[in-house]
Amino acid sequence: MSNEGGVPNVVKFAFGGTAGMGATLVVQPLDLVKNRMQLSGTTGKKEYRSSMHALTSIMKNEGVFAVYNGLSAGLLRQATYTTTRLGTYAFLLERFTEKDKPLSFGMKAVLGMTAGGIGSFVGTPAEIALIRMTGDGRLPVEQRRNYTGVVNALTRITKEEGVLTLWRGCTPTVLRAMVVNAAQLATYSQAKQALLASGKVQDGIFCHFLASMISGLATTIASMPVDIAKTRIQSMKVIDGKPEYKNAFDVWGKVIKNEGIFALWKGFTPYYMRLGPHTVLTFIILEQMNAAYFQYVLKRDVTSAL
């Protein structure tokens, strides 16, 4: 389908990043709790009994505003990863959709995986900084990296550990992104299509909300095992040239052996509480910006963003 007369591709990319950054401002504390829960157990003891215990412990021991540690990295991640993935998906969706003939769920999943893989490679450096900055407070004082912000984190990582460290864990990061986007983008598009086809829901914020919640749940279940592997690899320290984990399979093996198979879904509550609202807010903001562009710039009927 041609882009002629529609939203320019550069605007689609800008909308994607803006939507992701807006959502991150709201859910950053949940992302921090999720990361802390996934790192709990790496020191040989279970640091947090639950998500609420993690949240209260962080505020008590590190201060109320500590829940926003790593915000600059979170925003940069959205500016790189989400800008690329949503912009690429919107572009591919338009490119491969024929007039009056919706794409199959399988094809949407393939496009989502492609967009996610590309976006994740671009966003991995910010992801590394985010994982380290949100996890720093759980370490003993003498072991903390104490990054002052995302620029300081990226600069120090490059200087102290080499530029390639910015892409450490890139494989599980890309794998996670492909799983997330295949589930999230395809499920959102499909759920929205089904809701509108039912005739019971009109195309608007409520429809976008329902489709987003369905998408968020499916994505959480599918992606958590990959996410915990990514989190632990990106947070690990290399001692005497020996990394704690060799690869994602090594992480899964050690987690299952030492913590049990359900530990692969450790932090499910904050993960879904973060991913659910983040998915909802991202898609609603994206759809509203898209609608406003059609109404005030193109001055014609709205065509769905995704």
Curated annotation (Swiss-Prot):
Top-level taxon of origin: Eukaryota
Phenotype of gene-disrupted mutants: Viable, with no visible phenotype. Animals have increased levels of reactive oxygen species along with increased sensitivity to the reactive oxygen species (ROS) generator Jugalone (5-hydroxy-1,4-naphtoquinone). Conversely, display increased resistance to sodium azide, which is a mitochondrial poison that inhibits cytochrome c. Animals also have morphological defects in their mitochondondria, whereby mitochondria are smaller in size, abnormally shaped, and contain fewer cristae which are irregular and disorganized.
Cysteine disulfide links: none
Family annotation (PROSITE patterns): SOLCAR (PS50920)
UniProt cross-references to SUPFAM superfamilies, sorted A to Z: Mitochondrial carrier
Tissue expr: Ubiquitously expressed, but highly expressed in the anterior pharynx.
Bilayer topology: Multi-pass membrane protein
Keywords for the protein's UniProt record, in alphabetical order: Antiport, Lipid transport, Membrane, Mitochondrion, Mitochondrion inner membrane, Repeat, Transmembrane, Transmembrane helix, Transport
Record carries keyword rRNA-binding: no
Subcellular location: Mitochondrion; Mitochondrion inner membrane
Catalysed conversion reaction: (S)-malate(in) + 2-oxoglutarate(out) = (S)-malate(out) + 2-oxoglutarate(in); malonate(in) + 2-oxoglutarate(out) = malonate(out) + 2-oxoglutarate(in); succinate(in) + 2-oxoglutarate(out) = succinate(out) + 2-oxoglutarate(in); maleate(in) + 2-oxoglutarate(out) = maleate(out) + 2-oxoglutarate(in)
TM ranges: 9-38, 72-93, 108-122, 172-192, 205-226, 268-286
A single GO BP: lipid transport
Ranges: Solcar repeats: 7-95, 103-194, 203-292
Any one GO CC term of the record: mitochondrial inner membrane
One of the record's GO molecular function terms: transmembrane transporter activity
Subunit structure, interactors included: Interacts with ant-1.1 and ced-9.
Function: Catalyzes the transport of 2-oxoglutarate (alpha-oxoglutarate) across the inner mitochondrial membrane in an electroneutral exchange for malate. Can also exchange 2-oxoglutarate for other dicarboxylic acids such as malonate, succinate, maleate and oxaloacetate, although with lower affinity. Contributes to several metabolic processes, including the malate-aspartate shuttle, the oxoglutarate/isocitrate shuttle, in gluconeogenesis from lactate, and in nitrogen metabolism. Maintains mitochondrial fusion and fission events, and the organization and morphology of cristae.
Family statement drawn from the similarity comment of this UniProt entry: Belongs to the mitochondrial carrier (TC 2.A.29) family.
UniProt-recorded name of the protein: Mitochondrial 2-oxoglutarate/malate carrier protein
Organism listed in the record: Caenorhabditis elegans
Lineage, highest ranks first: Eukaryota, Metazoa, Ecdysozoa, Nematoda, Chromadorea
